[in-house]
């Protein structure tokens, strides 16, 4: 790395002064994001604050935004998904707080009476409260 590392640290420091973004060098990426060690993640990560986007200034049509974003920090309530379920396995009219999407796989496996053939991070026990009965 050498000179490139010095420039990277300077760029990181400069970007940290920009409002409405979080800036992380690869080794600073929070573990809770689960991609710190992914080969697709490069040396610098920027995450926009909720309601903000990071855009290329070379947009050929600056009067309109012609892209999409990948969302924001997954701990933000606005990034949580909606889950609606109906059927004989579910309590009628039941509502609960948000839960992690990783728990949907064990739920679907349970409903289909399938046993996952590998270790998974999801856990049916964390979301079984909306089922009529637990086996």
Predicted regions and their residues:
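Active-site neighborhoods of enzymes that stabilize oxyanions during catalysis
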Residues: 1-95, 99-107
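Surface-exposed patches in mature extracellular/periplasmic domains of secreted proteins
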Residues: 25-27, 118-121
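Long, internal low-complexity/basic segments
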Residues: 104, 119-135
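Sec-exported extracytoplasmic/periplasmic mature domains
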Residues: 16, 20, 109-117, 132
């Amino acid at each position: 790395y050498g000179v490139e590392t010095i420039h990277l640290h300077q760029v990181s420091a400069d970007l940290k002064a920009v409002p409405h973004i979080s800036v992380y060098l690869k080794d600073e990426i929070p573990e809770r994001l689960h991609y710190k060690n992914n080969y697709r993640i490069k040396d610098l990560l920027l995450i926009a604050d909720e309601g903000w986007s990071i855009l290329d200034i070379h947009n050929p049509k600056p009067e309109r935004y012609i892209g999409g974003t990948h969302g924001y920090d997954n701990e933000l309530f606005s990034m949580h998904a909606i889950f609606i379920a109906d059927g004989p396995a579910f309590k009628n009219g039941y509502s609960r707080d948000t839960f992690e999407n990783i728990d949907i796989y064990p739920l679907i496996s349970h409903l289909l009476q399938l046993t996952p053939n590998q270790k998974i991070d999801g856990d049916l026990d964390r979301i079984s409260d909306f089922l009529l009965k637990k086996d």
